């Protein structure tokens, strides 16, 4: 990165993607990192969050909530990395990242030959991201296709126009996305995904856990990620997704953290983090 580069500063919901990049950059510096994201620091720096960031709040409860959110980002990233590896091992060669933000999986993961990865997001984050990628001379490890469209619009048509083939299996990722959408928008999104999913498609989602808005968003600073959360997971996420044509499994952040050798020992049970993790197969 050079000091001469002028970046369009992130704003609104997509600005939270830069905060996610900062968390991934910090994780990547650990000796026991659950993943390595060599581009995360560049994204965070371009967004003004590296090397400095907003200080932790003085309030102990708020501090724990901030740490819980960061922890959840690390765990969900590893979870979805594994899901994509399993999907491609099963023969899936199309990947769609919905609300892609600063996701760098096209660049940091190994992909089988012939994999096409579509990044769907609004123009502003995609343009910001493209500037950083050019600066870093980043080279994707698969065919990477960006689709500039708002998910509130007719994104399936835009995705099809970009080359997505609904007749063959797709791995769909909705990471840190649904929690920002009202329930009717979540239902529409799931219906549209289903319409574009051949049998054998995979899906990975993160959902806001029950009570997350009360626990995390109620006292959130305006403009912060938590201040924009509006939806939580249904009481029966597996049954809910079955109604959309998916055979799903639901995992807690604490459960996955233990499996990854990173137990959440410093957090009380009621402060596990803001969400649950879903893996699903289209039948």
Swiss-Prot record:
Keyword Methyltransferase belongs to the record: yes
EC number: 2.1.1.-
Keywords, in A-Z order: Methyltransferase, S-adenosyl-L-methionine, Transferase
GO MF term list: methyltransferase activity
Entry binding sites for S-adenosyl-L-methionine: 121, 150-151
Region named Disordered: 264-283
Taxonomic source organism: Streptomyces coelicolor (strain ATCC BAA-471 / A3(2) / M145)
Enzyme class label: transferase
InterPro entries for the chain: Ppm1/Ppm2/Tcmp, SAM-dependent_MTases_sf, SAM_mthyl_Trfase_ML2640-like
Cysteines joined through disulfide linkages: none
Family membership: Belongs to the UPF0677 family.
Protein function: Exhibits S-adenosyl-L-methionine-dependent methyltransferase activity.
Protein name (record): Putative S-adenosyl-L-methionine-dependent methyltransferase SCO7813
GO biological process: methylation
């Amino acid at each position: 990165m050079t000091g001469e580069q002028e970046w369009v500063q992130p704003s609104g919901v997509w600005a939270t993607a830069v905060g996610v990049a900062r968390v991934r950059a910090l994780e990547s510096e650990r000796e026991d990192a659950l993943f390595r994201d060599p581009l995360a620091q560049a994204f965070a720096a371009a967004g003004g969050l590296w090397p400095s960031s907003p200080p932790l709040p003085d309030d102990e409860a708020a501090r724990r909530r901030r740490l819980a959110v960061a922890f959840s980002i690390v765990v969900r990233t590893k979870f979805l990395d594994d899901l994509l590896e399993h999907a491609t091992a099963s023969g899936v060669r199309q990947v769609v990242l919905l609300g892609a933000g600063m996701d760098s999986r096209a660049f940091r993961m190994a992909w089988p030959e012939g994999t096409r990865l579509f990044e769907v997001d609004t123009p502003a984050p995609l343009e910001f991201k493209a500037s950083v990628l050019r600066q870093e001379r980043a080279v994707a490890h698969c065919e990477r296709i960006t689709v500039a469209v708002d998910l509130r619009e007719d994104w399936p048509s835009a995705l099809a126009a970009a080359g997505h083939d609904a007749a063959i299996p797709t791995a769909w990722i909705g990471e840190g996305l649904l929690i920002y959408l009202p329930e009717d928008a979540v239902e529409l999104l799931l219906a549209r995904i289903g319409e574009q999913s051949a049998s054998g498609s995979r899906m990975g989602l993160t959902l806001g856990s029950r009570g997350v808005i009360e626990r995390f968003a109620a006292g959130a600073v305006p403009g912060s990620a938590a201040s924009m959360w509006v939806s939580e997971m249904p009481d029966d996420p597996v049954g809910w997704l079955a109604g959309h044509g998916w055979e799903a499994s639901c995992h807690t952040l604490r459960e996955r953290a233990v499996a990854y050798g990173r137990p959440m020992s410093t957090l009380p049970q009621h402060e596990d983090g803001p969400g649950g993790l879903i893996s699903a197969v289209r039948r």
